Amino acid sequence: MSNPVRFDRGHTDDLMSFLAASPSPYHAVTNAAERLEKAGFRQVAETDAWDSTSGGKYVVRGGALIAWYVPEGADPHTPFRIVGAHTDSPNLRVKPRPDSGAHGWRQIAVEIYGGPLLNSWLDRDLGLAGRLSLRDGSTRLVNIDRPLLRVPQLAIHLDRSVSTDGLKLDKQRHLQPIWGLGGDVRDGDLIAFLEAELGLSAGEVTGWDLMTHSVEAPSYLGRDNELLAGPRMDNLLSVHAGTAALTAVAAADASLAYIPVLAAFDHEENGSQSDTGADGPLLGSVLERSVFARSGSYEDRARAFAGSVCLSSDTGHAVHPNYAERHDPTHHPRAGGGPILKVNVNNRYATDGSGRAIFAAACEKANVPFQTFVSNNSMPCGTTIGPITAARHGIRTVDIGAAILSMHSARELCATDDPFLLANSLVAFLEG
């Protein structure tokens, strides 16, 4: 491949803004929706009847978003080209009774969401963000993006073996953040604080979905700014790339043989089994209703699904210079080497030979290099929404993503080239 596409500072700057502004899945879909609106997409409600008009549309349900672009004159049986991603990331989430404390410290009770690198949350300034449910049935987003919480590590003088035997954390006792002093802990203190922050009346908040986040901003790193450090790259990097790709394809308004789709799900990190997860009904419902809105039949629906393809885009593992032996000896994806194609013969990833050919063709069209990832046989392989999408909807699915280090850390690392290379490959795929 000659003169492949390289780093675009504008794309990566925008990714950094997107990461910083999206501390929860609810913020991520709101920010993605704003980008779609600017590109001419319009929101449709699941409770309304859908019309047959062409153009860009999207649905938001909680922390999930499905967006699609219908070309002028698209037949009911027109197949879909789908980019799948997820909006959630591992973190610490606030329990139903959050107010606690001990020995003169005020604390917040949290539960572990997904599989975070727990040590990365220690001694880090944390904010609080998410969604508040109000007495009148409405919801409000909240983002306390300043140092509010901290999980302090035990001093080495009280844990002399930590440097030789490794850090051992009890998930219940050792990860409850502090947020002040005082032994007088009252139920409702945290929610009263949030109500005051948002200018709400006392008692107006009756439910919440709240989570911690690092308040340190994303940043360029390295001698030549070749690296990008930031939170929630797994998997907002893919959500951002998918949004950019879909809006670019819609703006070009070329003669598309497929209907391009972005499916950004919640709850991937804990199994996808929810009404907003990939194992729920949302994607299938949206695709079916798109077919039926264009006067399609169940036969048209079957034809459309049979001809569709999904790229499940989720971050993957770049080879780690300090732990190269943890990777497969002959598959060492490099940071900066372009998107990775994920393969696993036990269907932990959905890629097969024909799927590889589809992605290779998209990368060739985009003049983007790609790499292949296979797990070391002695290490268990993770999974993605890819196999779920393939099994649930009968849609051919290919697992890909950008290569990063420190996956599931409060702060992850990638090469500055890779987000733009991924987005370009997605554009070529959606164009068909």
Curated annotation (Swiss-Prot):
Keywords, in A-Z order: Aminopeptidase, Hydrolase, Metal-binding, Metalloprotease, Protease, Zinc
Q: Which GO terms describe its cellular component?
A: cytoplasm
Q: Which GO terms describe its biological process?
A: proteolysis
Q: Which GO terms describe its molecular function?
A: aminopeptidase activity; metallopeptidase activity; zinc ion binding
Task: Report if keyword Protease is assigned.
Answer: yes
Enzyme Commission code: 3.4.11.-
Q: Which cofactor does it need?
A: Zn(2+)
Which residues of the sequence carry a binding annotation for Zn(2+)? H86, H157, H408
Q: Which SUPFAM superfamilies match?
A: Aminopeptidase/glucanase lid domain (SSF101821), Zn-dependent exopeptidases (SSF53187)
Which residue ranges run through the membrane?
none
- Top-level class of the enzyme under EC nomenclature: hydrolase
Q: Which family does it belong to?
A: Belongs to the peptidase M18 family.
UniProt protein name: Probable M18 family aminopeptidase 2
